[in-house]
Amino acid sequence: LGLCEPGNVGERLRAGDFALGGHQPVNPSGGLLAKGHPVGATGLAQLYELCAQLRGECGARQVAGARVGIAENGGGFLGVEEGATTVTIVEKVKA
């Protein structure tokens, strides 16, 4: 996804860049494990979180000034690789 330069992730994690309130918050909802990984509804749960963030409806886990959200979801397996992958990017626009 290009969130940081190769080899730089450890430094960025230690600096808190990906934490809520950081420069590039990642997974403010706690992710799918925090939701019990609702198999079959995983993609919908991710999309709901993105839309709620862009609408400013996330309370304590709200990313301040959220303008763009991205979700990646994979499922099914062919050997050891995912059989299908989707990437969803949503952006807040003015009506």
Where does each model-flagged region fall?
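Claisen-condensing/thiolase-fold acyl-transfer catalytic domains that form or cleave C-C bonds
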Residues: L1-A95
